[in-house]
Amino acid sequence: MSRLVVVSNRIAPPDEHAASAGGLAVGILGALKAAGGLWFGWSGETGNEDQPLKKVKKGNITWASFNLSEQDLDEYYNKFSNAVLWPAFHYRLDLVQFQRPAWDGYLRVNALLADKLLPLLQDDDIIWIHDYHLLPFAHELRKRGVNNRIGFFLHIPFPTPEIFNALPTYDTLLEQLCEYDLLGFQTENDRLAFLDCLSNLTRVTTRSAKSHTACGKAFRTEVYPIGIEPKEIAKQAAGPLPPKLAQLKAELKNVQNIFSVERLDYSKGLPERFLAYEALLEKYPQHHGKIRYTQIAPTSRGDVQAYQDIRHQLENEAGRINGKYGQLGWTPLYYLNQHFDRKLLMKIFRYSDVGLVTPLRDGMNLVAKEYVAAQDPANPGVLVLSQFAGAANELTSALIVNPYDRDEVAAALDRALTMSLAERISRHAEMLDVIVKNDINHWQECFISDLKQIVPRSAESQQRDKVATFPKLA
């Protein structure tokens, strides 16, 4: 039986309990436990890159991690992955800060990781690469003679040609992506956007619906919407409340709660969300004193100016809205710029009447799915969801909104707050059914199954591919 080798920018610590891990970690651990194998990635620490890999083995899984130098971390991670790819893939070209040394560092680190992984590989290993930090990784492995089946899954959106082609190195990135045998995306829109970008660069031959040839390489594209662990989340949500949360729930028993949580990021649409809530207070005054909106947004990438700007903007907006609409004994908006334990959040989800998830652009958004899974089926809350979240393709029984339209979001919030119990139960049941069917294990099993069906590349085909070129289209 072939081993599974997973490569991601970061690896979850071997001693981290699956229930406290994020969605990616849960899916990867499930796949690795089923097949046995290796999880390879950055340790999260800076230091001497020449040090031997740190290896930890538990059961049939080996964790192998490495350090990065300060320069490599800065160029590969901060200045290219997060200052170029992240904003561009989330349709924010205005925030892209392309620097040639950062691009060189991005390629250099991907080559370095390929060098470190190469001695660990076996001939029949199946290799699964994750996310935008590692777009060139298959290219680097192929250069080193690796003919194994290599799959790639992109967790964030893939932009349309008008956005992607603005990147100075777009053509190189597209050619490198063709070195994968299987390219997985969150949504059909992302898959088609990739093919549109590639078609603008070179000729793409499609042999069947999702099997293609471009740049002399044969590969498949497919959609794999990532899921969650609904049973585990329901268990966490239904458990006893900590004393402080139980007291808060009692104090708010006559108040309807609107709740949001995500890390502080410009892609999440937080300023637009605050303005939509203000529109609710302005246009539907009957809710004054009877609702409370809580936004939890822990700082991420706090050293980046764009993130500092959005934090200050939210602080100002929260103060302004509370000053304008607040009353003695009633604060309409609570904004908390701090981290909360994941299990505690599931309990807060459960007693919230409305889950407000309105990113401007998101690959999937697991918070939306977690909110649904955490609800009491007999008395569920209502999900208000952005049409630009990947989850909107599956959770069609949510109240789907355009996050740029504050009046539409306000109207959806009013509808959610006044929705009948029968409608809430019906909508929740439909969404929960989808979430249970397409859970995290279904996601990884589908991807691995499809990757296994691909015939490995031969040394002869690799050599033949080296001389196959296609001109750019005018």
Swiss-Prot record:
Its EC number is 2.4.1.15. It comes from the Bacteria. The keyword Transcription does not apply. Pfam families: Glyco_transf_20. One of its GO terms (molecular function) is alpha,alpha-trehalose-phosphate synthase (UDP-forming) activity. Signal peptide: none annotated. D-glucose 6-phosphate binds at residues 10, 77, 131, 301. It is an enzyme of class 2 (transferase). It catalyses: D-glucose 6-phosphate + UDP-alpha-D-glucose = alpha,alpha-trehalose 6-phosphate + UDP + H(+). Keywords: Glycosyltransferase, Transferase. The keyword Transmembrane helix does not apply. The record marks 86, 156 as: Involved in alpha anomer selectivity. One of its GO terms (biological process) is trehalose biosynthetic process. SUPFAM superfamilies: UDP-Glycosyltransferase/glycogen phosphorylase. Pathway: Glycan biosynthesis; trehalose biosynthesis. UDP-alpha-D-glucose binds at residues 22-23, 263, 268, 340, 366-370. Homotetramer. Probably involved in the osmoprotection via the biosynthesis of trehalose. Catalyzes the transfer of glucose from UDP-alpha-D-glucose (UDP-Glc) to D-glucose 6-phosphate (Glc-6-P) to form trehalose-6-phosphate. Acts with retention of the anomeric configuration of the UDP-sugar donor. Belongs to the glycosyltransferase 20 family. This is Trehalose-6-phosphate synthase. It comes from Escherichia coli O1:K1 / APEC.
